[in-house]
């Protein structure tokens, strides 16, 4: 099962929405690949450094999600993720 970063707001999760917006991770690291990839250092239950595949943002059915987080990103890391998503989607801030 591929690890993912949930980027959807808590309100939709709490409302029982049937899908969740995610960014998949890969351990196939690629240097200098921003903005399409962002590096996440190994921590908690995420055993290896991984790249977030920003260009593969998508919604998945909640039944595909496993309970419990492998790791949590800091506020600064999440802001970098959201900035990069906005850049890739050409959304003005």
Predicted region positions:
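C-terminal terminal-subdomain/extension
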Residues: 42-93
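Compact nucleic-acid interaction/catalytic patches
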Residues: 1-42
